């Protein structure tokens, strides 16, 4: 996976009060297939967030909400 881009990371860190430097996002074909298998737009395991096809769109309001939702899982799982 790849780290969050700098602008997105800064935006989310300021709202969560968390360091997301080691979060990895996956939005390739295997990630899309895994999300599809569990009928999810995205899912989180540990500090890795997997996105369905076309779901990683942090430049949009809907994309920010989805990413924030997944980052909440990171924090809730004690990985934040």
Task: Specify the residue positions occupied by each region the protein language model found.
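Juxtamembrane/interface and other helix-to-disorder boundary residues
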Residues: 1-80
């Amino acid at each position: 996976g790849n780290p969050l881009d700098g602008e997105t990371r800064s935006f989310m860190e300021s709202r969560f009060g968390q360091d997301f430097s080691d979060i990895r996002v996956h939005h390739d074909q295997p990630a899309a297939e895994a999300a599809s298998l569990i009928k999810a737009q995205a899912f989180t395991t540990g500090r890795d967030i997997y996105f369905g096809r076309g779901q990683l769109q942090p430049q949009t309001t809907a994309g920010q909400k989805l990413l924030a939702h997944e980052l909440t899982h990171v924090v809730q799982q004690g990985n934040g």
